[in-house]
Amino acid sequence: MTKTLPKDFIFGGATAAYQAEGATHTDGKGPVAWDKYLEDNYWYTAEPASDFYNRYPVDLKLSEEFGVNGIRISIAWSRIFPTGKGEVNPKGVEYYHNLFAECHKRHVEPFVTLHHFDTPEALHSDGDFLNRENIEHFVNYAEFCFKEFSEVNYWTTFNEIGPIGDGQYLVGKFPPGIQYDLAKVFQSHHNMMVSHARAVKLFKDSGYSGEIGVVHALPTKYPFDANNPDDVRAAELEDIIHNKFILDATYLGKYSDKTMEGVNHILEVNGGELDLREEDFVALDAAKDLNDFLGINYYMSDWMQAFDGETEIIHNGKGEKGSSKYQIKGVGRRKAPVDAPKTDWDWIIFPQGLYDQIMRVKADYPNYKKIYITENGLGYKDEFVDKTVYDDGRIDYVKKHLEVISDAISDGANVKGYFMWSLMDVFSWSNGYEKRYGLFYVDFETQERYPKKSAYWYKKVAETQVIE
């Protein structure tokens, strides 16, 4: 049976400042930790990325032509405050006003994120969100943006609090490149959630028009053997690290006893302790019912198996299938079902996981209001042929995920839109320029854009709301 989506559904495309803009030092932009980190550790930098800083009119014209009626954009904090605080950079402010005006001219609704992995270097080198002073700096930056950019109707505080803590302090593939420090992971999650809560409360108390929410990456976790209680426990603990801890903070305003039991177990085994203060929970509790929406970024699911060895994580950054490894002491190890389809980067393709995650939010956090799927897409080594890409694999991936969104809506979940990652090809944080996701192919040498086969398919779905 052919499935459909609601008439008012947003068919969006997603971007992020650092991954798309380029112009990393242009017009007074301050440095971010990634600038030097990429130079020192990787085979690529964020120059020129997709040159969105100069070419946004082209991308927004294409968006309008191809039925894309929403775009996720992030503001580069260091374009507004080059050192994260203090003096404002007027050229950065002007750039975003121009960008949002172009969005509205093209009838593409901007969903604007305040922080997408790019804390200004001056604050990042001072502890980033492990330093509680950063909570104040973020709230001040948020307040400036709420006041200044009144043309924005949809605000997101953070993109992917989970993967920030994970990338910075567990896997160690994000600056500062620390590995296996679970206490820092949870502390980073917690302090960022307090920052989110404070910003949301300020937004509502000040009476700004528009809506505000947060974007969480929520990879669904399953036991490798559902009949083995140890595997079930491994999946529960892994879910706490990546999903439940931040969801509890968002919608319960505290951490449930079950969540804290899991956190305490993980820290007992791995060492470290958390600094959770009474005023933090006052802030979390005050914001728990104020979120207008939840953004869910979903690409994959994981299967967890009981494991009692030492922690070892190997990140597959070059698309060499089968080269990744993930096992955490006292938690478990990832073990894919034998027949699970995977990308070249070892991400397990499992659309049902998105359905399960949406329904989990609906069941466990009934105060959620509404959901946007703020990122979903297929990273691929695209072959550019005849000025296009015949990306049938991407079409199939997106189609199957849109179908389960349709199912979730039929089953009572309030899902209002979908943003494909990514609108045009952008650079990938820990994989460079080879891993492409876009609807529009970018020739990074010339910065020309070419619609892929998926763009024509997506246009038809957006026009008809019929998934076929």
Swiss-Prot record:
Catalyzed reactions: a 6-phospho-beta-D-galactoside + H2O = D-galactose 6-phosphate + an alcohol
Domain of life of the organism encoding this protein: Bacteria
EC nos: 3.2.1.85
Binding site for D-galactose 6-phosphate: Q19, H116, N159, E160, N297, S428, W429, K435, Y437
Gene Ontology process terms (BP): lactose catabolic process via tagatose-6-phosphate
Pathway: Carbohydrate metabolism; lactose degradation; D-galactose 6-phosphate and beta-D-glucose from lactose 6-phosphate: step 1/1
SUPFAM superfamilies: (Trans)glycosidases
Keywords annotated in UniProt: Glycosidase, Hydrolase
Active site: E160, E375
InterPro entries: 6P-beta-galactosidase, Glyco_hydro_1, Glyco_hydro_1_AS, Glyco_hydro_1_N_CS, Glycoside_hydrolase_SF
A single Gene Ontology CC term: cytosol
Pfam families assigned: Glyco_hydro_1
MF annotations from Gene Ontology: 6-phospho-beta-galactosidase activity; beta-glucosidase activity
Enzyme superclass (EC): hydrolase
Claim: Hydrolase is one of the keywords in the record: yes
Stated family: Belongs to the glycosyl hydrolase 1 family.
Protein's name in the database: 6-phospho-beta-galactosidase
